């Protein structure tokens, strides 16, 4: 996996986790508020938010460079299952 892709994926996960914390702690009232502050569309924020709940094994694979080379931020975020096992299966992470 290219270093730029790895960095983009990890940055997206970190942002998504931060946004969820903001909502949970009441620092932001909505995804629309976050989108305005981030100068992004609310749709993009809502697309990325599920990355906050990404399987720890997938995050570790991104960090150590063993994640599939065709993994992208948008591809990973799109229709992300809630189950960690299903997430891992979807991207082809071997057990």
Model regions and ranges:
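Short, Lys/Arg-enriched anionic-surface-contact patches
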Residues: 1-23
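C-terminal interaction appendages of subunits in large macromolecular complexes
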Residues: 4, 38-40, 48-52
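Non-catalytic, well-ordered alpha-helical scaffold segments
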Residues: 7-10, 17, 42-46, 56
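Conserved phosphate/pyrophosphate-binding and hydrolysis machinery centered on Walker-type P-loop NTPases
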Residues: 9, 38, 66
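Helix-turn-helix/winged-helix DNA-binding modules
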Residues: 11, 26-27, 37
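Short, solvent-exposed alpha-helical "recognition" segments
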Residues: 25, 48-62
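Short alpha-helical "recognition helix" segments of helix-turn-helix
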Residues: 30-38, 45
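Intrinsically disordered, low-complexity basic tails/linkers immediately adjacent to helix-turn-helix/homeobox/MYB/SANT
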Residues: 61-95
């Amino acid at each position: 996996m290219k270093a730029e892709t790895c960095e983009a994926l990890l940055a997206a996960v970190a942002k998504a986790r931060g946004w969820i914390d903001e909502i949970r702690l009441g620092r932001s009232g909505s995804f629309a508020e976050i989108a305005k502050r981030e100068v992004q569309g609310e749709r993009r924020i809502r697309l990325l938010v599920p990355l906050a709940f990404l399987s720890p094994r997938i995050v570790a694979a991104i960090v150590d460079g063993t994640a599939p080379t065709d993994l992208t931020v948008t591809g990973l975020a799109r229709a992300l299952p809630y189950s960690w096992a299903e997430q891992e299966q979807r991207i082809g992470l071997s057990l």
